[in-house]
């Protein structure tokens, strides 16, 4: 693309009349939305992949019903990712997951109408088929990258095949969460929600593939969950959904709640600020009441897993974690530090006010 950089007649906007060039800002929005969406999906998978590794190292006697000690149990804890729909977004997402997380090719499967067109991914070892039900039944995390018009039929195909513990991650923004929950008959669904700022700087570039764009430090900063740089704003309820999804993953393996809290602290709060050393009490640590009401915690037995959380409810209503994270700026800072570290960017404490900008959640859909 560098060879064409100075050839104005070959640029996208060359043939657009001057009076219509106002709409070119939509191109930047589209690209920003795709990059930010893929980055958040990659962070989500990185957290799940790391959690899977941590779970493999836990003693097998955590819960009486956990009785398998063989290699099959270890394999069962590996993260497997399925993608339904492999248009432009699906391909970019696949490449980001393979190169950034990274997800091993053998742990990634794609279902698309034209699997024969994905020759390059097949060469890498990714299984590409046209079998939505098979991919849905195999995956622990399932991404929906199809068109809104295709979604009802796809849901009909896969709803009876989905494991209760599978986390469905939907990029189909036109379908509200309650409707998606009904179509899939499934509660473990995460759907990021975005809105756009009116005034913004287009930081997203033009021609780079998303994995390459995510090597740019400015773009990495722009994708931070608490940052509105670049004009694409994530609904911070996504962070809550991620945390409760991780808890559900532990619950599916019958891990006691006390051990889950240790895992979450190790997974989400490994980075520390200088203030954590000078003032240890300011360093955030997760507690039971951060995720459940005090009345429920009082009646929770010590050697029990967390209850199963409906992720659609988590994203649509106020939760104990909503109140906790909004009242704890240091927790937001720690999550921002971790997010940047996942993408290979180390940021200083002085940069945090520009990275971890507190943004109010979007108006929830009904």
Curated annotation (Swiss-Prot):
Species this chain originates from: Mus musculus (Mouse)
Lineage: Eukaryota, Metazoa, Chordata, Craniata, Vertebrata
Task of the protein: Probable oxidoreductase.
Known EC number: 1.-.-.-
Broad class of enzyme this protein falls into: oxidoreductase
InterPro entries (alphabetical): NAD(P)-bd_dom_sf, P5C_Rdtase_cat_N
A GO molecular function held by the record: oxidoreductase activity
Domain of life: Eukaryota
Name listed for the protein in its UniProt record: NADP-dependent oxidoreductase domain-containing protein 1
Family as reported in the entry's similarity comment: Belongs to the pyrroline-5-carboxylate reductase family.
UniProt keyword terms in alphabetical order: Oxidoreductase
């Amino acid at each position: 693309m560098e060879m064409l950089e100075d050839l104005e007649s070959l640029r996208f906007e060359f043939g657009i009349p001057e009076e219509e060039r106002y709409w070119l800002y939509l191109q930047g929005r589209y690209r920003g939305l795709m990059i930010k969406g893929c980055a958040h999906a990659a962070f989500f998978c990185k957290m799940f992949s790391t959690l899977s590794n941590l779970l493999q190292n836990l003693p097998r006697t955590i819960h009486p019903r956990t009785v398998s000690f063989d290699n099959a149990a270890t394999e069962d804890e590996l993260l497997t990712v399925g993608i339904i729909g492999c248009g432009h977004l699906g391909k970019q997402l696949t490449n980001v997951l393979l190169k950034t997380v990274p997800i091993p090719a053998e742990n990634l499967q794609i279902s698309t109408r034209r699997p024969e067109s994905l020759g390059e991914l097949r060469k890498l070892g990714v299984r590409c088929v046209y079998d939505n039900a098979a991919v849905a039944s195999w995956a622990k995390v399932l991404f929906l990258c199809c068109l809104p018009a295709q979604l009802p039929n796809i849901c009909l195909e896969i709803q009876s095949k989905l494991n209760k513990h599978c986390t469905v991650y939907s990029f189909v923004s036109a379908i509200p969460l309650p409707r998606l929950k009904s179509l899939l008959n499934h509660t473990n669904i995460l759907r990021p929600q975005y809105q756009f700022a009116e005034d913004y700087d287009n930081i997203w570039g033009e021609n780079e593939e998303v994995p390459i764009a995510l090597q740019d430090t400015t773009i990495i900063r722009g994708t931070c969950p608490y940052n509105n740089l670049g004009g694409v704003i994530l609904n911070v309820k996504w962070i809550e959904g991620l945390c409760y999804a991780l808890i559900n993953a532990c619950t599916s393996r019958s891990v006691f709640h006390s051990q889950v809290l240790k895992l979450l602290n190790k997974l989400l709060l490994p980075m520390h600020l200088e203030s954590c050393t000078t003032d240890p009490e300011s360093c955030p640590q997760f507690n039971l009441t951060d995720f459940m009401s005090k009345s429920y915690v009082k009646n929770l037995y010590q050697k029990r897993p967390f209850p199963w959380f409906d992720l659609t409810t988590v994203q649509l209503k106020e939760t104990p974690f909503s109140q906790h994270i909004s009242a704890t700026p240091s927790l937001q800072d720690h999550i921002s530090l971790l997010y940047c570290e996942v993408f290979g960017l180390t940021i200083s404490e002085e940069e945090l006010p520009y990275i971890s900008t507190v943004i109010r959640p979007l108006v929830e859909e009904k």
